[in-house]
Amino acid sequence: CQMVERGLDAKAKAAMLDAHDXARQKVANGQEAGQPGAXNMKELH
């Protein structure tokens, strides 16, 4: 088996980052059970 490609393309990276930022935003807003809200949690870009 020969590896042809590795890593994520730009579209996959953007989708992963958007999902991560959405989860961080829920925590920051205090919408995630068991997690305190954040006063200053910036998005990743």
UniProtKB/Swiss-Prot annotation:
Query: Which subcellular locations apply to this protein?
Result: Secreted
> What's the PTM story here?
Contains 3 disulfide bonds.
Q: Which UniProt keywords apply?
A: Disulfide bond, Neurotoxin, Secreted, Toxin
Q: In which tissues is it expressed?
A: Expressed by the venom gland.
Provide the GO MF annotations for this entry: toxin activity
Entry-linked InterPro entries: CAP_sf
UniProt region (Disordered), positions on chain: 26-45
Instruction: Kindly report the protein's main subcellular placement as a broad class.
Output: secreted
GO CC terms of this entry: extracellular region
Give the free-text miscellaneous remark of the entry: Shows similarity with the venom allergen 5 from wasps. This similarity may explain why patients with allergies to centipede venom also display allergic reaction to wasp, honey bee and/or yellow jacket venom.
Q: Which family does it belong to?
A: Belongs to the CRISP family. Venom allergen 5-like subfamily.
Q: What is this protein called?
A: Scolopendra 20417.15 Da toxin
Question: Which species?
Answer: Scolopendra viridicornis nigra
Q: Write the lineage as a comma-separated list.
A: Eukaryota, Metazoa, Ecdysozoa, Arthropoda, Myriapoda
